[in-house]
């Protein structure tokens, strides 16, 4: 197979039977590129968001705690240079096959959330028109994870274009599409955890509807704190 990240041809992942039958499994990146992603662990960093720090809680989580917003996140990987390149190709250059890179890891991680309804963070209409797919839904579909698409997002510019103060001043961007789909235990799934502003808005919206048990899951988390 030709790696979609480094474009090198990699035959090391093929079994003898696959080579004979010429029916290789659909790996889309090589082992070298896959190994460049840094897995996160709560045991080695922030106990509430998985940022890799030398304290039990990072400044971002302390900040949100003072605002009365509970932080309960789990993230698979650190947002390093390899992850930055991956998301650039997947989200902004539209290489849709890259949705399959973390399928195995997502399946394994979400098994711990039995009894939770999976809710993907939506794109705005403008964002969807530009990208033509929701990357979070693409991850879930690749892993055959059922989900409820109960949130919608207003148009209003990209979060990544805003600084800390601008993110904090943003009015509520999210609305509920169908309150009848609400459940007691919700797992909000997003791609990258940055400041927590997006998740704080979603949590506020859901808590106003009486939902208290809300957890969050991310593919990747920035290693630095935005509110320190």
Please tell me what each predicted stretch does.
Residues 1-228:
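Glycine-rich phosphate/pyrophosphate-handling loop used in enzymes and phosphotransfer proteins
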């Amino acid at each position: 197979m030709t790696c979609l990240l480094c474009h090198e041809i990699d035959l090391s992942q093929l079994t003898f039977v696959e080579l004979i039958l010429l029916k290789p499994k659909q790996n889309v990146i090589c082992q070298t590129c896959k190994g460049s992603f840094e897995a996160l662990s709560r045991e080695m960093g922030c106990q509430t968001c998985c940022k890799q720090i030398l304290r039990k809680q990072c400044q971002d989580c302390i900040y949100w705690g003072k605002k009365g917003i509970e932080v309960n996140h789990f993230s698979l990987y650190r947002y390093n240079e390899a992850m930055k390149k991956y998301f650039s190709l997947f989200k902004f250059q539209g290489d849709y096959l890259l949705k399959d890179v973390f399928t195995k890891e997502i399946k394994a991680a979400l098994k711990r959330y039995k009894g939770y309804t999976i809710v993907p963070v939506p794109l705005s209409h403008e964002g969807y028109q530009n990208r033509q797919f929701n990357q979070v839904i693409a991850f879930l579909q690749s892993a055959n994870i059922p989900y409820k698409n109960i949130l919608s997002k207003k148009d209003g510019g990209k979060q990544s274009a805003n600084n800390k103060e601008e993110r904090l001043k943003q009015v509520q961007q999210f609305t509920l599409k169908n309150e009848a789909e609400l459940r007691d235990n919700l797992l909000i799934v997003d791609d990258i955890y940055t400041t927590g502003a997006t998740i704080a808005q979603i949590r506020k919206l859901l808590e106003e509807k009486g939902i208290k048990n809300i957890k969050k899951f991310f593919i990747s988390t920035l290693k630095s704190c935005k509110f320190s």
